[in-house]
């Protein structure tokens, strides 16, 4: 049991929710009345999200969600934080709970074989296995599994095209896919199996479950795991890391990255300096000045973002 004050719950569940719109208001009210913050996505295909609150509040929310028909057994991972990692609570209605943009993909009908964290090393060490990181380029940049291919995608929508263009790398191989918490692999493996590949596997519970359960000394993970909240990234044991976000482009940056001549807090980093005009950087600099003034007044540090 962690002594940290905030519990972070990452969850998803694919299940038919024909009346998903009606779930929004009760969820939003429960979260707001219990001080829970984060994001929950609802769609006809299920629920997905990450939220944080006191342990008691998160327990109440999970009880509410699992009482909904079809959502009794979500994929659920807990971690802990020293500070509230979200600024507000959002419950959104979506077309997909994870956006791939390919019609007809249904993980309830066809999906890859789940591999437990304890069995993952043996699979990816097999010379006949090709390991595919289904996440985006900025996530891959700060951490991945040994030998994993980087599709160099900016969004998950680009992943199907990468698969189509790289079929030769997958032919005749065991295909082992992974992502942060497992949800992207539900659709990624369903898509790949739909193309006719048979030996398709994915890491159950994703990187987060692996980092939680596999000891550092046995780990084949290198680096940190990007998470979509103010913690930015976590390491083995789901400990918070020293990775931060560039507030101009939202890329993760390490302490070493902050030594770059192109880094200016809230204004630019080496990754985005050439992507912005001098006018952009001047605008960001003014915004950063206002953020600092707000912090000095004790206001929320996200003002102006």
Curated annotation (Swiss-Prot):
GO terms for biological process: tRNA modification. CDD domains: RHOD_YceA. Residues 125-219 form the Rhodanese domain. It comes from Brucella anthropi (strain ATCC 49188 / DSM 6882 / CCUG 24695 / JCM 21032 / LMG 3331 / NBRC 15819 / NCTC 12168 / Alc 37). Keywords: Oxidoreductase, tRNA processing. This is tRNA uridine(34) hydroxylase. PROSITE patterns: RHODANESE_3. It catalyses: uridine(34) in tRNA + AH2 + O2 = 5-hydroxyuridine(34) in tRNA + A + H2O. InterPro entries: Multihaem_cyt_sf, Rhodanese-like_dom, Rhodanese-like_dom_sf, TrhO, TRHO_N. The active site is at 179 (cysteine persulfide intermediate). The keyword Cell inner membrane does not apply. Its EC number is 1.14.-.-. The gene is trhO. Belongs to the TrhO family. Catalyzes oxygen-dependent 5-hydroxyuridine (ho5U) modification at position 34 in tRNAs. GO terms for molecular function: oxidoreductase activity, acting on paired donors, with incorporation or reduction of molecular oxygen. The keyword tRNA processing applies.
């Amino acid at each position: 049991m962690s002594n940290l004050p905030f519990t972070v719950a990452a969850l998803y569940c694919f299940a038919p929710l024909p009346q998903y719109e009606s779930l929004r208001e009760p969820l939003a009210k429960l979260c707001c009345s219990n001080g829970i913050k984060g994001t929950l996505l609802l769609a006809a295909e299920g629920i997905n999200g990450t939220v944080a609150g006191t342990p008691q509040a998160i327990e109440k929310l999970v009880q509410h969600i699992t009482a909904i028909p079809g959502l009794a057994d979500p994929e659920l991972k807990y971690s802990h934080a020293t500070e509230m990692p979200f600024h507000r609570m959002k419950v959104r209605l979506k077309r997909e709970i994870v956006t791939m943009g390919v019609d007809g993909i249904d993980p309830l009908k066809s999906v890859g074989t789940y591999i437990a964290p304890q069995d993952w090393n043996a699979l990816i060490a097999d010379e006949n296995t090709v390991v595919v990181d289904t996440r985006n380029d900025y996530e891959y940049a700060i951490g991945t599994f040994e030998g994993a291919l980087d599709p160099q995608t900016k969004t998950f929508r680009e992943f199907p095209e990468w698969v189509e263009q790289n079929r030769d790398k997958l032919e005749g191989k065991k295909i082992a896919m992974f992502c942060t918490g497992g949800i992207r692999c539900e659709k990624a493996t369903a898509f790949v199996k739909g193309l006719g590949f048979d030996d398709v596997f994915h890491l159950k519970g994703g990187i987060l479950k692996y980092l939680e359960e596999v000891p550092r000394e046995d780990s084949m993970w290198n680096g940190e795991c990007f998470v979509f909240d103010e913690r930015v990234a976590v390491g083995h044991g789901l400990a918070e890391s020293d990775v931060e976000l560039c507030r101009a482009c939202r890329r993760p940056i390490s302490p070493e990255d902050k030594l770059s001549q192109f880094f200016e807090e809230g204004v630019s980093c080496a990754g985005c300096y050439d992507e912005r005009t001098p006018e952009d950087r001047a605008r960001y600099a003014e915004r950063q000045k206002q953020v600092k003034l707000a912090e000095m007044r004790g206001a929320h540090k996200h003002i102006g973002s």
